[in-house]
């Protein structure tokens, strides 16, 4: 649930950015990068002469609210020009919030969207909560529960949709193993999966491991 599902922004690439932080609560970041290498598969410097550059700007507010705790509120805007691998120019936006509600509980939300027909998800809405160290066993332990609503773009998918929107309920439990690793079982329950003609429901199970160095 943490990713921007409608993003058309390049996953990597050579670029520059600048950050302005007038105080500890506010941060403004803007920049750009080469738009030609959509997948960021390698460091390429010879594409700058093509003059295709992505651009982005974000504003973040990170207050500490008395009686609640730390929070983060941010908005991002970006533009991706049309290139050979992604011919359509797109403009996207994302609004994100997260707020501690005491020492253990936190809530989060995200709303994002994108123009055009490049991303299979053109609008996404997420709301969820996490509970940290529920058994007072390991600081890395965390339980999370979230709900997402995704608008699907049929033109981007390239085939007839059975549903034009998907609803997803996700739950996970990150289980800390000492200080250096977590093991996380995760379940996603899809209601009205867009491309499944045989069922109005689908379930995805995953198991992830994360190492900390």
PLM region descriptions:
Residues 201-213:
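Outer-membrane beta-barrel "beta-signal"
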Residues 16, 57-59, 95, 107, ...:
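Membrane-embedded beta-strands of outer-membrane beta-barrel proteins
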Residues 25-30, 66-73, 104-107, 136-138, ...:
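Repeated loop/turn-to-beta-strand initiation elements of outer-membrane beta-barrel proteins
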Residues 30-34, 73-79, 111-113, 127, ...:
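Transmembrane beta-barrel strands of outer-membrane/channel proteins
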Residues 8, 46-51, 82-89, 114-124, ...:
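Solvent-exposed loop/turn segments connecting transmembrane beta-strands
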Residues 1-54, 155:
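Surface-exposed coil loops of outer-membrane beta-barrel proteins
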Residues 87-150:
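A beta-strand-loop signature enriched in Asp, Gly, Thr, and Trp
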Residues 20-22, 61-63, 99, 111, ...:
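Residue-level signature of outer-membrane beta-barrel architecture
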């Amino acid at each position: 649930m943490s990713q921007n599902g409608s993003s058309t922004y390049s996953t990597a690439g050579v670029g520059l950015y600048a950050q302005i932080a007038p105080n500890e609560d506010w941060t403004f970041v803007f920049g750009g990068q080469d738009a030609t290498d959509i997948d960021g598969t390698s460091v390429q410097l010879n594409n700058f002469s093509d003059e295709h550059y992505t651009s982005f700007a974000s504003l973040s507010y990170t207050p500490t609210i008395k009686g609640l705790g730390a929070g983060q509120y941010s908005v991002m805007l970006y533009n991706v020009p049309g290139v050979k691998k992604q011919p359509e120019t797109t403009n996207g936006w994302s609004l994100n919030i997260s707020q501690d509600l005491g020492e253990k509980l936190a809530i989060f939300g995200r709303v994002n969207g994108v123009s055009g027909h490049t991303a299979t998800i053109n609008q996404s809405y997420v709301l969820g909560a996490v509970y940290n160290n529920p058994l007072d066993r390991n600081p890395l332990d965390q339980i999370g529960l979230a709900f997402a609503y995704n608008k699907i773009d049929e033109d981007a998918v390239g085939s007839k949709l059975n549903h034009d929107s998907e609803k997803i309920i996700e739950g996970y439990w990150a289980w800390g193993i000492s200080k250096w690793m977590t093991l996380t079982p995760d379940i996603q329950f899809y209601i009205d999966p867009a491309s499944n003609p045989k069922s109005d429901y689908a379930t995805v199970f995953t198991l992830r491991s994360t190492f900390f160095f």
